[in-house]
Amino acid sequence: MAQVINTNSLSLLTQNNLNKSQSSLSSAIERLSSGLRINSAKDDAAGQAIANRFTSNIKGLTQASRNANDGISIAQTTEGALNEINNNLQRVRELSVQATNGTNSDSDLKSIQDEIQQRLEEIDRVSNQTQFNGVKVLSQDNQMKIQVGANDGETITIDLQKIDVKSLGLDGFNVNGPKEATVGDLKSSFKNVTGYDTYAAGADKYRVDINSGAVVTDAVAPDKVYVNAANGQLTTDDAENNTAVDLFKTTKSTAGTAEAKAIAGAIKGGKEGDTFDYKGVTFTIDTKTGDDGNGKVSTTINGEKVTLTVADIGIGAADVNAATLQSSKNVYTSVVNGQFTFDDKTKNESAKLSDLEANNAVKGESKITVNGAEYTANATGDKITLAGKTMFIDKTASGVSTLINEDAAAAKKSTANPLASIDSALSKVDAVRSSLGAIQNRFDSAITNLGNTVTNLNSARSRIEDADYATEVSNMSKAQILQQAGTSVLAQANQVPQNVLSLLR
């Protein structure tokens, strides 16, 4: 080998090897300090690309798992609201069963309907206000896609349905709808109700005021109607007097009258304090004189005491034919009503509905005025019409009664088959709740699968990019030894040109 000083080949060779060991040492230290086998693309270009794709998948699937948990939360929120709607529907059904019982009064039905209305309004409130992260989940039909994968199209769809009173088929649900108005309803529900009932007795027609019961003729200029005191017939003359029937007319009866004999016989057969009836009057034996029938009896008529005295029956008489009767007051019987009076003249009385019925009067239609509007009622008073249309009584939420025609009543009538309507609504709610329960289970399965996939991808990525510490420590030790050896050898290689000086001495 030539002896030269310009180029130290041994030194250059040693430096090159030292640089290689330095690079190996740096790489080993970098991997050991980072824990990664691939710290840059130069370490393993293909491996870095593969590991990066794994990282994308891992991050995407991890977020997808969180998305699936959000999906469960949405389903739980919606299902919780539906549970409360279900509770309200159950109460509405319970109230509807109560309302169908025939023992309920109008006020009972109104109270039941008031609570039903509040429950239905609460259903609408829950529907309109239930939301998840600002998204209303029951106010409209909606399909919410939940991303449960790392790539496009990997979604699970939650079907959200609009659930409110209308969508449940309970819009206008009513157990206390309007009912056909009757004359009694008008009189009890409204103020300033006037009118009359019409009656016909033979060729004559009459009106009866619905409030006072006064009877007048059904004419352009109606006259007041009276009952004739003599024969009980209807008349428009109030001045005619009629003679009453004698009961005890004279204060001094002649001997042997039927009255005297009857009362004398009662005294003879009784004792003081006994009572007996005669001509519909109850008498008391006040005084009994002997055993022949002489004595006094008394009674009270129209609040006044009347005393009858029986006398002139001889002692030991075999009968009472000779008895005389004296009355403290003249007493008569009315030919009209059979009541007792002390006057032998009775005046015609104002006719009443009972007098019309006694004269076989037949009731016709009625004319009723309510708040200035005139209505017609049929003969029985159970059907009110206006312009040919049947009228109905409707009560507002505040309990105020109003009259509406049959067209308006049809829109507010009681719900037909209310229990079937509620059962249908409950079935719809149950179907939506079942769907939400199933979707929650599906999300649970998706989350489990995503967790397994992320675990496996992490393992695969680790095998590609993570550093093997056993290998890297060996590489580092080797590089350190080579560095030490190379440094020592380089020092000796740098001394080789010194040998040329020995030739120059």
Curated annotation (Swiss-Prot):
Family per record: Belongs to the bacterial flagellin family.
Miscellaneous comment as given in the Swiss-Prot or TrEMBL entry: Individual Salmonella serotypes usually alternate between the production of 2 antigenic forms of flagella, termed phase 1 and phase 2, each specified by separate structural genes.
Subcellular location: Secreted; Bacterial flagellum
Gene transcribed to yield this protein: fliC
Known role: Flagellin is the subunit protein which polymerizes to form the filaments of bacterial flagella.
Pfam families: Flagellin_C, Flagellin_N, FliC-like_3rd
Gene Ontology MF, one: structural molecule activity
Official protein name in the record: Flagellin
Annotated source species: Salmonella rostock
Keywords: Bacterial flagellum, Secreted
UniProt xrefs under InterPro entries: Flagellin, Flagellin_C, Flagellin_C_sub2, Flagellin_N
Chain segments annotated as transmembrane: none
Keyword Secreted carried by entry: yes
Entry keyword annotation includes Isomerase: no
GO cellular component: bacterial-type flagellum; extracellular region
